[in-house]
Each structure stands twice: as structure tokens, then as C-alpha cells.
Amino acid sequence: MTLKNKTILVTGSEGFTGKVLLSLLKNNGAKVFSTGLSQKVDKFYYQCDLANEKCVINMIEEINPDEIYHLAGSFSNDFYIDLESNLITTRNILESVYKLRKKSRILLIGSSAEYGSIKHGDNPISELHSLNPTSMYGLTKIFQTYLMKLYVELHGLDVVMARVFNLNGKGISDKLFIGNLYKQIKDLKSNKIKEILLGNINNERDYISVNNAVIAYIKIMKNGITGEIYNVGSGKPEKIECVLNQILKEEEISKNVVKTNCKPNMKYDVKTIFANINKLKKLG
């Protein structure tokens, strides 16, 4: 894989996945610009509030990117926060590329939360499965999906989407199960807490390493068909308890300090969900 002569913009570059993507793109010869809210001196970094359309227009006009990876977003489940982070920022990027008449190819990050409540027999879930969100986060991601389709169909923008299942890796946001587990392990080792409190660990999810997910993003950016959505996952279910045991073993933590079912069950807690990744595999 070579990306020489490519100018690429990555949003959400200060997140764990963004850092992994930045490193891989740079190592393959791309000229990579990143953006975030923090202040730092770097000619390849732009401090920009993506919810501010003027800021986004100025940034894209100056960088003139061949490709844009839009990784920035939130999963707070607060409607207004997620609406701004997941929808308004996306709209500003798409609108800026349209207004500036840029030819940038854009990759958006969707979520398996868009599928929401499913039946066990529906697995593996394909991109054609109905969307039944059970969270504000999932709902705003569906809005993002339809926004993509609108800009592709009405304005001819070159946009593709990676619909991501569960990411696995040290450094992931502590709002996700694995990130929260690592945070509690860190607190346990520093004697801030005496035990690790978790919810239901009997459900099955589709976990993919951050490294493999990022490779899939690049593949979709390179070979994906404009306007199409591609599931990104391992394509197989894994019991949350197995993931827990693996991490505890790696961190040399006894399972005796773990207390489960300490958090209220969600009304629409899905027992098993995993991706059909045949469409992604066809990209090579």
C-alpha cells in the first residue's frame, strides 16, 4: 500500500483510533493533516471546531485534501451532544466540500448501533438489515447515514461509510466496555478502587482490533463504491466474558475482584450481534 502524493485530512485525530490511522497513513507516504480542539503548534494540525461551518470551510480550502477521514464524533447518548458531534460536524464537512467544489473522497464512520434491536436469527447482520436504534447515539448515526446519501444523490459527492461494530484495544474510550474495563484495572492497580464492577458479561458481540478496523477504513476509502456502506467487524460473535478473561490474564488481575451484573440491564439489551462482512471482503 502506497499513499504517496496523497493529501489526507483526519478528524478525531486525537482519539485512539485516529492516532492509529494517522500513524498508518504517514508510514505509507501520505501527507496527513489532522484537526482537533486542542492547541498545539504543528503545521500539519488545525485547531477547528467542526460544528463551526466557517472554520471547516477555511480549513478544507487551505488543505485541499484528496481524502477526508471523518472519525470525530461522540456517543454520550445525550441527544444534543451527539446530534452536534455526529450530524452537524458531518454536514459541515459535506457542505464545505460541496460549496468549494472539491473532489475530496470522504469516509464517514457509522455504527452497529444503527441496527439496534435485532433477533438472534438475523445474524450475521448485513448492511441491508433494517435500522432499529435503541439509543440516541444510534439514532444520530442513522441521521448521518441519510445525510451521506442525500449529498451523494443531490450533489454528487464522493462519500463512503464504514459501519463499525465493537472496537478492541487498549486506549479506547472508557465509555465503551473495554475502555471502561481498562480504566477500572488502572484504578485497581493504583488502589483507587477495591473491585471491578461490570454489567452483563454473557452477551456476545463482534469485536475487531483497532488496527484491523483502521486497515478496513483505508480499504474502503481506496476501493469502496460511492454512496455504499460497509460493515467493519470480525464477522464472528465473541462472548463478552471471554474478552474479559483475556484482558484480566494479560493484566495479571484475578477474576475474584470482578463483580458482574452491577449495572442495570438495558431494556433493549441485545444478546448476540455480529456482522456479515462479505461486502467488505469483496474489496480485496
Give the location of each predicted region.
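NAD(P)H-binding glycine-rich loop region in Rossmannoid oxidoreductase-like domains
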Residues: L50-N86
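Conserved Rossmann-fold NAD(P)-dependent oxidoreductase catalytic core, especially the SDR/UDP-sugar
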Residues: H70, N92-S135
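Active-site helix of classical SDR
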Residues: M136-F143
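C-terminal "lid/loop" region of Rossmann-like NAD(P)-dependent oxidoreductases
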Residues: I196, N200, I229-Y230, E238-N245, ...
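Rossmann-fold cofactor-recognition segment
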Residues: Q39-N52
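SDR active-site strand-loop-helix element
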Residues: T11, T35, I68-A72, I106-S112, ...
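N-terminal Rossmann NAD(P)H-binding glycine-rich loop of SDR-like oxidoreductase domains
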Residues: I8-N27
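NAD(P)-dependent short-chain dehydrogenase/reductase
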Residues: I118-H120, Y146-R205, V210-I218, P237, ...
